[in-house]
Each structure stands twice: as C-alpha cells, then as structure tokens.
Amino acid sequence: MSIEKNLELVHRMYDALNAQDLDAHDKYWTQDMIWHGPPAFGDIHGLEGFKYEVLKPFYAAFPDYYVKNDIEVADENWVAATGFLTATHQGEWLGIPPTGKPVKMRFSDFWLIKDGLLSENWVMTDDLEVMRQLGVDLLARRDKA
C-alpha cells in the first residue's frame, strides 16, 4: 500500500482505540495478527486475544483512555509512531486498585502491514512511569531491598 494509505489505516485504527470499539478492529487487523507487548507482557496471537486480553482489560482500568501520535514514520510496509496516552485510573490495572489518578503514558508502536491490514504490532510503553504516577514506585522498592 502507499505510505498515505498505511498512515490512514493506523489513524482509523486509533479512532477505534479511542472510541473503545472492539468490533471495529476487525476492519483494521488480520485475524492472525500478533501483538508483541512491552517487556513482561509477552505476545498475544490472534485478533480475538488482542481485543479481549489486551484492549478490554485496559479499557476497564482506563475508561477515558485517549491516545495520540506525536511523530509518525511510514513506508510501503511499515508505520511507526510515538506519542502519549492519557487516561484516568478507574479500574484495577496490573494488580493496582483504582486510584482515580490521571496518567500520561509514553509509548512507541511499530506496525507491519500485509495485504492492506495491520498484521503485527510491537509495543513499547513506559509502564514504570505510569506505576509511579499511580503511587507505586518500583525503583524505590528496589533501593530498600
């Protein structure tokens, strides 16, 4: 696909993310997609797993989730982006009970596009910083050990 169409595909997928529309993702991803999560999260194989093991729990924890790319780079097969996700912690996330605190998460994403659909996604997020914003400072705990 063209660079413009690849960017448009990612933008439409982000619209679905921000609308928390799980079913809309069927239009943007291959059924056998692979989500390569941040360290310790592992990989999820398949669109249904991505929707119900990654997105749905995250939406439950952060129901006002909003993600925006600040920088995007693309070619005929790839799109890469970095930006910030903003949300309010209103449900359990990684064992942390709801705090009501706002968070700002730095992220980078890389998508491989095949046959006009997103087929793989490599995700890097600053989860330690988000935990710190929620009152859990893992590095301070390390220093006390």
Each model region followed by its residue ranges:
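Short, structured motif recognition centered on aromatic/hydrophobic residues
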Residues: 10-11, 35, 108-110, 118, ...
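Intrinsic, low-complexity N-terminal interaction/targeting segments
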Residues: 79-82, 94
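A short, structured loop/turn motif at beta-sheet edges
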Residues: 72-80, 112-119
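A cross-kingdom feature marking solvent-exposed beta-strand/loop segments within repeated
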Residues: 39, 91-103
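Low-complexity, intrinsically disordered terminal/linker segments enriched in charged
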Residues: 121-145
